[in-house]
Amino acid sequence: MAMQKLFTYIYEFIEYRKMVLLEEKVPYDKFVQMVFNTGFFRINAETLNHGIVSVFIFGANGKYVHHGGDMRTLLTNTLNEKKQYEELILIVDKPILGKKNILDIIVEQRAANPTVVINIYPYHLFCINIPKVSAIPKHKLITQEEAQEFLGREYLQPQDLMQISASDPPVVWLGGRPGDFVQIERPSETAMHAVVIRFITKSKI
């Protein structure tokens, strides 16, 4: 069931982020075959800024999430390709996020490739279309100029704002980065919506 949802919603995620697929969407059976037989399924897409984003969905029992050397080789070879990489998104079964050898490789690859955003997330972030969940308030990234205008009007500094992690599900779907600002519309008893601004901070992983 998780794989079926991942297959459905990862493409909705790419569309929501306004990315363009660089290959045709594959049938579900091929997706499953790749995840379980090869160990991962890869989607390549292009951003509005013409940067390349590669999404890797790893099988829960594949060699890449259990053997650090295989993960290191995969990421190194990917980033050595002659492409203008903007982001790598690694999607894994939640227990993998507790494996130190895998997380150490993520840290290592970030240090070696400072211009590329490399993030690792659990399956469940992509097993539902987060922006369509009615219980979650509307989130929207705002520009630095809009944020500075708000801060100036309220006589605030960025550190005065409440924070939100870059790994928060709505922020992940928006593509928010540490240092960005997100506007959240919450229901209000005195108005249609109460608008709050949050400062995005680095995630723990």
Curated annotation (Swiss-Prot):
BP-aspect Gene Ontology terms: transcription by RNA polymerase II; transcription elongation by RNA polymerase I; tRNA transcription by RNA polymerase III; viral transcription
Localization (cell): Host cytoplasm; Virion
Matching InterPro entries: Arch_Rpo5/euc_Rpb5 (IPR014381), RNA_pol_subH/Rpb5_C (IPR000783), RPB5-like_sf (IPR035913)
One Pfam match: RNA_pol_Rpb5_C
UniProt keywords, alphabetically: DNA-directed RNA polymerase, Host cytoplasm, Transcription, Viral transcription, Virion
GO CC terms, sorted: DNA-directed RNA polymerase complex; host cell cytoplasm; virion component
SUBUNIT field: Part of the viral DNA-directed RNA polymerase that consists of 8 polII-like subunits (RPB1, RPB2, RPB3, RPB5, RPB6, RPB7, RPB9, RPB10), a capping enzyme and a termination factor.
Family named by the database record: Belongs to the archaeal RpoH/eukaryotic RPB5 RNA polymerase subunit family.
Function noted in UniProt: Component of the DNA-directed RNA polymerase (RNAP) that catalyzes the transcription in the cytoplasm of viral DNA into RNA using the four ribonucleoside triphosphates as substrates.
Protein name stated in the entry: DNA-directed RNA polymerase RPB5 homolog
